[in-house]
Design a protein with these regions (language model features):
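Active-site helical microenvironments for divalent-metal-assisted chemistry
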Residues: 1-179
Length: 179
């Protein structure tokens, strides 16, 4: 029931949003994160947090709402995936990388699924629009490459998970193989 409630909650919170530079409803991303976590046999809490992972950062959701509806553990997982938008892009990304090194397994799994969904989307969009893809982001391609490579390195202890292997492979293709 928690997963069902999280889907409804996230769908309502993200209802007017689109994926960056596309007409794709934003909710597709949390649903893909849910699918990735499910395929990798993750816990219900990780799956619920994966569905909700962008609600604090990208909507008007308050932490108390998540804690009341889903509990403190899920709130903490969601908070671990949320960035402080008052900081610069580089500061936010460096903070994420630094924290990941000491984070819990569940936090790392949610992060890995989120980044895999993002990198899949970037790769598919690159196939459609080429180098114009990089114009959508708040950082140039070389900084995105640094970030995704650093995230992949920080998640290296997930190397027994299928999603990690796909993340590592897709990051390599997108940033090392394609010009």
């Amino acid at each position: 029931m928690k997963i069902h409630n999280a889907i409804i909650f996230a769908t309502l919170k993200h209802q007017s949003q689109k994926r960056k530079g596309t007409d794709i409803p934003y909710i597709v991303h949390p649903m893909e994160v849910m699918q990735i976590l499910t395929e990798n046999d993750c816990s219900e809490n990780a799956i619920v947090a994966g569905i909700l992972h962008d609600t604090l950062e990208d909507t008007d959701t308050r932490p108390e709402e998540i804690e009341k509806e889903f509990g403190k553990e899920i709130l903490e997982l969601v908070q671990s995936e949320s960035e402080d938008k008052s900081k610069s892009w580089k500061e936010r990304k460096q903070h994420t990388i630094d924290c990941l090194k000491n984070d819990t397994l569940e936090t790392k799994l949610v992060c890995c699924a989120d980044k895999l969904s993002n990198i899949r989307s970037m790769y598919a969009d690159f196939q459609n629009c080429g180098a114009d893809l990089w114009k959508r982001f708040n950082a140039p391609k070389d900084e995105l490459a640094w970030y995704y490579r650093s995230i992949t390195d920080a998640l290296a202890d997930l190397n027994s998970f299928k999603m990690y292997a796909e993340l590592k492979h897709t990051v390599k293709i997108l940033f090392d193989t394609i010009n």
